[in-house]
Amino acid sequence: CVGSRDTNRCGNGYCSSVCCMYALKESMIAKEHAHGDLDCAIFNMDIRTFGKDYEKYYLRARDKEGVRFITARVHTITEVPETGDLILEYADNSGAMKQETFNMVVLSVGLQIQPGTAELAKRLDVKLDKYNFVESDPFTPVNTSRPGIYTCGVLQGPKDIPESVAEASAAACLAGAELAEARGTEIAKVEIPEPIDVYGQKPRIGVFVCNCGINIGGIVDVPAVKDYAATLPSVVFTDDNLFTCSQDTQDIIKEKIIEHQLNRVIVASCSPKTHEQMFMETLEACGLNKYLFEMANIRNQNSWIHSKDPEAATQKAKDLVRMSVARAATLHPLHEKKIPVIKRALVIGGGVAGMNAALGLADQGFPVVLIEKEERLGGMANHLTATIEGADVGSYLEGLIEKVTAHSQIQVLTRSLIVGFSGFKGNFTTEVLVGPGMYERKIDHGVVVLATGATEYRPKEFLYGKDQKVVTQVELSKRLKEKGAKDLNRVVMIQCVGSRNGENPNCSRICCQSAIKNALHIKKHQPDTQIFILYRDIRTYGLLEDYYTEARKQGVIFCRFDPEDPPTVESSEDGIMVTFKDHVLDSDLRVSADLLALSAGMVAEDTEELASIVKLARTAEGHFMEAHVKLRPVDMATEGVFVCGTAHSPKLLSESISQALAAASRATTFLSQPELTLSAVTAQVNADQCASCLICVRSCPYQVPRINEDGVSEIDVALCHGCGVCAAECPAKAIELNWYEDVQILSKVDALLEGVM
């Protein structure tokens, strides 16, 4: 919290949202690179690992990697003249002064808006808040005070990469709606050179070895790997680069392909999952078929897991490159198929996220079918009263429902259940049982947006359900709206109920601000009410920190508790008796409360059946898993399927709205195209060898193979996902997967075992 959560030194009262996580990351990387026992300590006020699966990362750092976490603000740093070491002085939880000596001190520096950026916003007549972030409404998070100008990323408020990427897509969605009528009028066609005919040519392989900064180069002897590659058969050019994925290096690769007449290209770097497509496009720009490309993953499969043995990592990198060279020599061009796109979207889930996604698509001119399993739209928002900023959720929800149901491009199906799903990107078919009569309907659509939402955890602990004086924060909000706070003299709130535990290790993100919102509401209408908030870490990230500060000013008492020694709750005639340990007094406190409010976490809706029908990956907690946490935060691994809102992970209403618009924006990139390209990596059947044994039919996770009228297996390449299960299972070797043919796989195996057998 250097430069954040500090109104005394720098005036930045907000939390910068990213500092805890990058301190965690850097400490773990430091321990990996130290090649020995390195003591890493993180001094903190609160650990704010509130993102999706961030808490698991924190637990790994603390419990497995041995990073120490000290809850304290450092008072003084003094240098030891003789050694240059640094002495840190701080007060521990009991108030006692402590000292520790370190070789290095790293400051987790926060984020702030540059003066030039603030000046630009003012020239554009865009309103800023007191910290120079763009003012926005919780229900229109990427809109600014000036119509037609949108905001995203840190300019809107402190946030990390996934939220910034999603907000960028959300802003693009709203801008796209304004420009919908002009779609397609300003497209510049990318000219791709005539493909080079490589049939009959001997392989001429180029190998580009990447340092990936220090991720690879800090462990592997990259120049040695490059020199080794030059000795391999058919390799005519080698090079090493700091970052092979950079635009400069892409241009160099193009130059070298032409200069050395390369007809196969290998990049030895990171994961093909994130970078393969980019390198393939580089080949296409030179006229080379994109499937004449091979990638050796010498980072994830090598330097990261052998970081303590550089010599072995270097040898393994050579092995991986040798294997890739052997496979590259067997590659041949493959050709992709074009398919038309059904210009309709299916949105599953009629909560705030689902409705905003539907509007984001419909306002750009695309028909939308919105499916909701309940009778009423709104989802969890039907149980919410107001945001922490004071915005009325109920009136917003009514307006949103009215807008959706009245939209000419949106068809709403309530009380509907999905029972079947088939197809591929741009051409899906979903079977739905609609209404009380459960009549069957088939919907053809080009994309899917998942917005199935989440629900409040129903506590099993702290006497919830056994004593009427124990409620959740959602129930308390409703009570305050209906009855006010007149009868409340003392209230206790317990945080992290149903979150950050064995069953649900993640932070539910909303609980701290929900507690503070209700506490401020009570204090506003009943200032003399005593309020105790028992917490593990207060996670009012970003601009929410101001509300935490205000709650303290209003006299709300915050007491930290250890999860190993949680509060205990008993019913009594006078109310609810809560016992907890106060770390400052180092003794147990007993508080008799009129009401106990549990900050219950957020749990995913039951998504198991839907995930099974649509064939989608989920986290252990039941949330849908995105394709890439940072680069593709709303895309699913299945192309044409997108996720948003609390179906993705717990989040605030404003964040769900941003992510819904982002999913709509990403879906538009499919719907706006006249046709889509199918991957050439599909399974092919040799009918002469097929024994009609049905093993491929039974083993395919997507139910693609079928036995045709000739009695042999047939695989529709448009439906094939290229997973290769059928090719691996076929006992007659009648099925082969393009780009993973037997000769290509076996060439790698032979190269690996070279000199061994």
Predicted regions and their residues:
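Residues forming the flavin
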Residues: 1-757
